[in-house]
Amino acid sequence: LKDLEATRALGRYLVQQPERPSLLLLEGTLGAGKTSLVQGIASAMGINEPITSPTFALSQHYPQGKPPLVHLDLYRLEQQAAANELFLQEEEEALGMGAMLVVEWAERLSLQLPEAWRLKLSHRNDGGRLARLTRSKAGTC
């Protein structure tokens, strides 16, 4: 991914897939592009409000999306038990509203989530990003 717009485009692409994920786990260091990817996802869902990382609020719900979007950020939760508990609460709510759940800093979780898609973003030396998508049930893309 050569720049943040390419990262957003990847987010839009994921939502447009016939078998798009209902649970997307994002991993990567600060500045790797996790929130930019969520901006692309939200754009493809018709969400027009600004998308920022919910680092302090921990989660943000966008019920107007098609489908709705729940954006969870586990950055501040250093203990796995707290991250797991919050994730399970948000997952239940997302399921109830038919939403896609996107989790930033998913490496904080210790849960087995076989239905999840996992996207790892990392920095490249040329300033771009490398994205590796793993679909647990269907292998790696």
Roles of regions detected by a PLM:
Residues L14-P21:
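Phosphate-binding P-loop
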Residues T29:
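P-loop (Walker A) phosphate-binding loop of NTP-binding proteins
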